[in-house]
């Protein structure tokens, strides 16, 4: 699917009836296999609004170039390369669940403005075990179709979220010297292995606020065939969220209130 410049794609499901975007193979086995279709390609100057949608099983999920995207209450999983591939785009996502993407669940290139609140960005996979499988990859650079490098300022805010995987590191930042690279990780659970791999110092950075590293979220089931990224009793995500941040997204992806003792991630524990 291709959305041309100046066009708007509205995907409006409900809690009871999510809009499903997948390949044309109807057998359930293909719901857990990537590379069945290409992507939703958003041209420069296009707009996306997505609410209560399930997007899975292709090469890239949302392939956006200078796109303005608003994503709420949605699932993006099982893609050969990226769930979200964004070049110089503006993305606002609340109650987003991601998993099982080869290169990275979210790939941010040539900067942009990105806000992820109460997101569960996991990346676990047997099938794609040889890939990088980052949770978030962000850089100021992007190589265009002519193989020329373009640069862009980046603002990235991840709040009350989980970014975790079975890899040693789930967040990778590559800043270009002299380019704006502002990020905030607030009240999050992050898989982190060190400055050289992640591109930032979790322990000393003032951009890391009340977040924890390497605390297993205790997902119910992170494998694609029976994926359930709610957290179990005893999860460090329970009560981890900022109440002030939770007030901006007061119900979770299943319409459960989170205004009290908010759980980081897309699901409120109850």
Tell what function each PLM region has.
Residues 1-227, 238-249, 253-254, 267-270:
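Beta-strand/loop edge motif enriched in small/polar residues
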Residues 231-232:
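Beta-strand-rich, repetitive solenoid scaffolds
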């Amino acid at each position: 699917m291709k959305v041309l410049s100046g066009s708007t794609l509205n995907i409006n499901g409900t809690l009871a009836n999510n809009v499903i975007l997948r390949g044309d193979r109807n057998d359930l086995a293909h719901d857990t296999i990537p590379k069945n279709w290409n992507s939703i390609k958003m041209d420069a100057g296009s707009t996306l609004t997505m609410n209560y949608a399930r997007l899975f099983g292709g090469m890239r999920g949302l392939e956006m170039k200078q796109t303005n995207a608003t994503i709420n209450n949605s699932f993006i999983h099982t893609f050969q390369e990226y769930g979200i591939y964004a070049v110089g785009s503006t993305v606002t996502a609340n109650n987003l669940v991601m998993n099982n993407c080869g290169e990275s669940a979210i790939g941010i290139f040539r900067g942009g403005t990105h806000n992820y609140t109460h997101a569960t960005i996991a990346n676990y996979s047997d099938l794609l075990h040889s890939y990088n499988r980052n949770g978030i990859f962000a850089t100021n650079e992007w190589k265009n179709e002519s193989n020329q490098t373009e640069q862009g300022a980046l603002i990235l805010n991840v709040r009350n979220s989980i970014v975790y995987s079975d890899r040693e590191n789930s967040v990778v930042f590559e800043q270009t010297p002299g380019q704006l690279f502002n990020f905030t990780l607030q009240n999050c659970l992050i898989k982190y292995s060190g400055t050289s791999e992640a591109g930032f110092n979790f322990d000393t950075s003032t951009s890391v606020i009340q977040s924890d590293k390497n605390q297993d979220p205790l997902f119910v089931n992170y494998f694609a065939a029976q994926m359930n990224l709610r957290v179990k009793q005893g999860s460090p995500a329970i009560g981890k969220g900022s109440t002030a941040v939770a007030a901006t997204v007061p119900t979770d992806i299943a319409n459960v209130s989170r205004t009290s003792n908010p759980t980081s991630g897309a699901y409120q524990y109850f």
